[in-house]
C-alpha cells in the first residue's frame, strides 16, 4: 500500500475551525523554499521547478531527476502522485559548507517548494518569531525571517562564486549514492557542522 503525505486540514487533524490557507504563486518563489511544518515530505510544482532550474543554470548548476512513487493529499482532495523527485543544489546566505542537495517530489500542481517538517528537523531548524530570525543549527546559519504571501520562506539560492566547480559535486555524482537515495536530503562529507547530525544515514 502507498503512503500518503497529507497537509493540515480540519477534516484530517480534527481542528475545530478551518485555518486560512494562502494561494501562493510559484512563479515568483523561484529560489525560495516555503517552511511547511505540516508537510511530511518535501514537494514542489512543475512550474516552480522550471523557474528554479533557470536560476541554477545561471550558476552552472543543475537539477538531478529520479523516478518517484510518492503520493500526496491536499486537504480532502484526491491523492496526487509524483512521477519524479528532483534533487536541487542549495546554498543559504552565510553558509560556509558546500554540497547540499534537497530532495523534492515534483507534482503537476502550481505550488512552490514546500519544505517538510522532516527536512527542517534534520537541518536543525529553529524559528524565532520574537526576534524574527531562523536558525539552521546544523549548517551554522542564522537568517532574518522572510515572508512571502503570508508564508515563512528562506532563500536557498545564495550561491557563492565558482560553487559549480567545488569538488563536493564530484562526490555527490557517485553512482552508489543513487541506488536508494535519501528522499529529503543528500550531502557531501563535511557539509554539516561536526557532530550536529544524529539521524542521517551515512553517505560515504
Please identify what each model-predicted range represents:
Residues 15, 41, 65-67, 162, ...:
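Intrinsically disordered, low-complexity regions enriched in Ser/Pro/Gly/Gln/His and often acidic
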Residues 66-84:
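C-terminal reverse transcriptase regions that engage the nucleic-acid substrate
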Residues 82-204:
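Aspartic protease core domain of the pepsin/retropepsin superfamily
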Residues 20-67, 102-104, 108-116:
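Aspartyl protease active-site motif detector
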Residues 17-22, 28-30, 73-77, 120-122:
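Eukaryotic intrinsically disordered and solvent-exposed regulatory patches
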Residues 1-26, 204:
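Charged, flexible boundary elements
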Residues 41, 69-71, 131-133:
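Structural motif
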Amino acid at each position: 500500500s502507498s503512503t500518503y503525505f497529507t497537509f493540515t486540514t480540519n477534516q484530517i487533524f480534527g481542528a475545530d475551525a478551518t485555518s486560512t490557507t494562502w494561494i501562493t504563486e510559484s512563479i515568483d518563489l523561484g529560489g525560495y523554499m516555503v517552511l511547511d511544518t505540516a508537510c511530511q515530505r518535501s514537494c514542489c510544482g512543475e512550474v516552480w521547478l522550471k523557474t528554479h532550474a533557470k536560476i541554477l543554470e545561471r550558476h552552472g548548476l543543475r537539477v538531478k531527476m529520479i523516478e518517484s512513487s510518492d503520493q500526496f493529499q491536499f486537504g480532502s482532495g484526491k491523492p496526487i502522485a509524483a512521477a519524479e523527485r528532483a534533487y536541487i543544489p542549495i546554498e543559504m546566505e552565510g553558509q560556509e559548507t558546500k554540497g547540499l542537495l534537497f530532495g523534492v517530489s515534483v507534482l503537476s500542481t502550481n505550488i512552490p517548494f514546500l519544505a517538510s517538517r522532516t527536512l527542517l528537523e534534520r537541518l536543525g531548524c529553529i524559528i524565532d518569531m520574537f526576534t524574527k530570525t531562523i536558525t539552521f543549527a546544523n549548517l551554522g546559519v542564522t537568517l532574518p525571517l522572510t515572508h512571502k504571501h503570508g508564508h515563512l520562506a528562506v532563500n536557498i539560492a545564495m550561491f557563492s562564486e565558482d560553487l559549480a566547480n567545488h569538488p563536493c559535486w564530484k562526490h555527490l555524482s557517485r553512482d552508489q549514492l543513487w541506488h536508494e537515495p535519501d528522499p529529503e536530503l543528500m550531502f557531501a562529507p563535511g557539509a554539516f557542522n561536526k557532530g550536529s547530525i544524529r539521524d542521517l544515514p551515512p553517505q560515504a
